[in-house]
Amino acid sequence: LSLSLQKIGGSSAIFACKPARLPSPFTIFVFNISNRNDDMTEYRKPTPAEIEALTAAGNSAENWDAIEVAQNFTPAQLSGCRLEGRVQIGRGARLRRCTIRNYRIGEEALIEGVTALECRRESSFGNGVRVAAINENGGRTVRIYDRLTAQTAYILAVYRYRPEAVEAIERMIERYAAERRDTLGTVGPHARITGARFIREVNIGKGATIDGASLLENGTVCAGAYVGIDVQARDFIAAEGARIDGGTLLERCFAGECCTLDKHFTAVDSLFFANSHCENGEAVSIFAGPYTVSHHKSSLLIAGMFSFFNAGSGANQSNHLFKSGAVHQSVHLRGCKFGSGTYIMAPAIEGPFTLVLGRHTQHHDTSAFPFSYLVEQDGRSALMPGANLTSFGAVRDIGKWPERDRRTVKRDRINFEEDNPYLAGGMIDAVNTLNSLAEAHPDAESYVHNHALIRSTQLQRGLKLYNKAIVASLGAMLRNGEPGRAARAAGTMWRGNTFPAGR
């Protein structure tokens, strides 16, 4: 996530104008607004003969005059249904053994065995819901909507020192939520809803599937998303291709494109972005950037920011320091991993691609040292700078992420390149920091930097690893950049200490 934000978060020019005149980068995140109902079907009232046939098939209506059907409607489309309030039934839609109140049913949709599909009041269907991500007390609240991106959410949560920009984006989201408000819910074309119990104030997108959900309330299930057995979700949005299954419990959550939440996972006030996969455990007030992964029952992710992350069994954090309350937060930069049994007491921060092992209670800040190991030694947090540069696990992770990208819309901007200015610059800063420590105390056996212990031998090893990696990274960026591609095409690319013949 950090890599994908450099072009946005790293430039102050994007906020140089007045909030009311935010430039185009924000319009693509927020103002991709389509009409609330783009169904062009012409509807009519059912004829007396059709009403008689419908009644004979076990159907009933609170008021048949409030029911509208497509021009080519046939009574065979309904069986054993109760219709209340205003209901529109699209071409070829099939309704079996269900109760429907105040809904538009798209063409070829299937609704079968549903206790109640109802819109009881005017609703924005999850758009505009406030999610207390990162900080459990709401200091970094993000308002969700069905086209939310990781980039927009990041700016809303992190750029609190730019209040005018945050307020401007929130106003845009508020207008978007107002545009979505309606007294009728929508079931999109070719959607399938089977075996569900209570679905209330939920918009269901084209081709979405709801199979056996227990309770869905005030939300949006976007096109192609799947909601399965025993799921309970309130104030939520499931983006395109998201899969929520296996008794998952959600409250005030956003599940991004192609996210998977499964196997009794529980989440409150959390954001999950592209291709994240969480099972069994729980999450509270987290910002889960793309590819955040947690598979184990005993894992708790709380009050933090993650991306390209993997939590081991029993991984845990604490954001509550008793007298001060649950006001703290942690940041685990791109590519961090927690080993089994890892514990971190917030506030704390780790640099990109850091492997964390053991218990850490001293509120470390290792953000200046990418590709490191942070381990527990004699009750202290010991840092091994650059140690992860020698791990094949990091190489494997970097290679597998683009291969596992299942998205079609690709609303989140993700940079998969491992050789980039963000990481190269981080390693250069790490070398400068290590050299400063060594020069200040050349004979020391160990150093302490931001509550992390660094052994002298590990410092020297880290310098060697970082310097090698910097050279390799800069070479790769030059080779893969536009000048490098042009040089290769012309046969003038420098390789090692030789040039092509004749140069």
Where are these regions (language model features)?
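Short, low-complexity, intrinsically disordered N-terminal modules
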Residues: 1-2, 13
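Glycine-rich hexapeptide-repeat left-handed beta-helix
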Residues: 41-64, 95, 99-177, 211-214, ...
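C-terminal non-catalytic accessory extensions
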Residues: 443-503
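Core alpha-helical transmembrane segments of integral membrane proteins
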Residues: 187, 191-225, 229, 235
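Residue-identity detector for glycine
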Residues: 9-10
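Short, Lys/Arg-enriched N-terminal segments with co-localized hydrophobic residues
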Residues: 21-39
